C-alpha cells in the first residue's frame, strides 16, 4: 500500500467505527492539528493509527496481517476484527510477549517472520537429533523497504525527545521500540530491538489493577536487561538493505523539500514510495509539528530532533 509515508500529514482527531470513538491516552479526542506519521508514532497517539486502519488500510486487510502475517494466535475474529483491536491493540484476550517479540523482529531483519523456538537443536547421548531448528526458514511478511522504513520510524521512539521510549534506549546501540499502555493503566508494554536482540516486556498484575508507578516499568526492565547483555558485545549497526532512502522533506507539507522550503527535516522512504516535491506550504496554519520535528537537520540514522520539542512533551500521547 503506497499511500502512507514518514512525513504524511494526518489529522489528530477522533474517528468513529460502530459505537467506538478513538481517544488518546490523555482522555482527549486529539489536538485537531495535522501531525506526521512519524510524530504520531513517536508520541504514541491513538487517533492516527485508528484513522489509518479505518480509512486507508481497512479492517479486513489489517486483520489479515495480524493473523496471517504476524501470526498472532490470540485474535478472536468475532470481536477483534474491528477498529479498536486492530489500531490500538485492545484485543479480547490480549497477546503474549513471545508473539509480540516474533512480530517485531521483522522490523529489524528486513521483513522476515521466524516462528519462535526455545531450543536450537538437541541430541541424545548417541548423537541422535531429537529437536532441530537449525533450518528454521523465515517467511517474508514485509517488503525490505517497508521493514527498513518501519525500523527507522520505531527508532525515533527512543531518539526523539518527545518519544515515549526516550528513557529506555539500549546504551550504545540503535534501538527500535514501541511502548504500550492499556485502558485504566492496568498494563504496560515495551517491545524493543537492537542489531543483536529483540524482546517484549509486559508489566502488570495477575488480577488487573491500576499501575501507579511513574513512567513505564516495562521499558525500565527492558533497558536494564539489554544494557547488561550488550555490555561486552562489539559495535554493530543495523544492515541497510537498499530498500529505503533518506530524503529531506518540507515540514509544512510533508513533501520532498524544494529550494523554496524554509523549514525541513529528514525522513526515510521506500524507494518506490517517495513523495513529490513541495510546490507550496499548505499546512503552516494547521500543523503543530513545526516545534517538534522528527529528525536532525543533517541526515543521520538515529539522531534526535534539532528543533524544540518542549512544547510537545507527550501531549495527547500514550504516557
Predicted feature descriptions by range:
Residues 1:
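Active/ligand-binding-proximal structured segments within catalytic/core domains
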Residues 4-62, 125-156:
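Conserved catalytic neighborhood of penicillin-recognizing serine enzymes
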Residues 5-6, 39, 94-271, 275-281:
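A penicillin-recognizing enzyme superfamily signal
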Residues 9-11, 87, 200-202:
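Soluble periplasmic/extracytoplasmic beta-strand elements of cell-envelope proteins
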Residues 20, 38-39, 50-51, 64, ...:
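Extended, charge-rich, low-hydrophobicity segments
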Residues 21-28, 56-101:
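Mid-domain, small-residue-enriched loop/turn segments at the edges of structured enzyme/sensor domains
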Residues 46-48, 82-88, 135-136, 206-210:
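Glycine- and acidic
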Residues 280-319:
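Ser/Thr/Gly/Pro-rich low-complexity, disordered linker/stalk segments of secreted
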Amino acid at each position: 500500500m503506497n499511500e502512507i509515508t514518514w512525513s504524511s500529514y494526518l489529522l489528530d482527531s477522533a474517528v468513529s467505527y460502530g459505537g467506538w470513538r478513538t481517544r488518546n491516552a490523555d482522555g482527549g479526542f486529539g489536538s485537531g492539528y495535522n501531525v506526521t506519521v512519524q510524530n504520531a508514532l513517536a508520541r504514541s497517539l491513538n487517533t492516527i493509527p485508528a484513522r489509518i486502519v479505518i480509512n486507508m488500510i481497512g479492517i479486513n486487510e489489517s486483520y489479515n496481517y495480524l493473523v496471517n502475517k504476524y501470526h498472532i494466535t490470540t485474535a478472536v475474529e468475532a470481536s477483534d476484527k474491528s477498529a479498536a483491536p486492530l489500531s490500538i491493540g485492545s484485543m479480547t484476550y490480549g497477546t503474549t510477549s513471545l508473539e509480540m517479540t516474533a512480530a517485531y523482529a521483522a522490523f529489524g531483519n528486513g521483513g522476515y517472520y521466524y516462528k519462535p523456538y526455545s531450543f536450537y537443536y538437541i541430541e541424545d547421548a548417541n548423537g541422535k537429533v531429537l529437536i532441530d531448528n537449525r533450518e528454521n526458514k523465515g517467511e517474508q511478511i514485509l517488503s525490505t523497504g517497508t521493514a527498513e522504513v518501519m525500523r527507522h520510524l520505531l527508532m525515533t521512539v527512543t531518539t526523539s525527545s518527545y518519544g515515549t521510549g526516550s528513557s529506555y534506549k539500549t546504551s550504545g546501540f540503535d534501538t527500535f521500540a514501541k511502548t504500550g499502555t492499556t485502558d485504566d493503566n492496568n498494563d504496560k508494554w515495551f517491545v524493543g530491538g537492537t542489531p543483536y536482540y529483540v524482546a517484549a516486556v509486559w508489566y502488570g498484575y495477575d488480577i488487573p489493577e491500576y499501575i501507579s508507578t511513574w513512567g513505564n516499568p516495562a521499558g525500565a526492565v527492558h533497558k536494564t536487561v539489554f544494557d547488561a547483555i550488550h555490555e561486552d558485545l562489539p559495535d554493530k549497526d543495523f544492515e541497510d538493505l537498499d530498500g529505503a532512502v533518506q530524503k529531506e522533506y518540507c515540514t509544512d507539507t510533508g513533501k520532498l523539500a524544494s529550494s523554496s522550503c524554509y523549514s525541513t527535516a529528514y525522513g526515510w522512504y521506500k524507494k518506490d514510495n517517495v513523495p513529490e516535491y513541495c510546490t507550496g506550504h499548505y499546512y503552516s496554519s494547521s500543523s503543530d509539528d513545526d516545534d517538534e520535528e522528527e529528525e536532525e537537520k543533517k541526515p543521520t540514522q538515529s539522531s534526535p530532533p534539532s528543533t524544540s520539542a518542549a512544547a510537545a512533551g507527550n501531549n495527547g500521547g500514550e504516557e
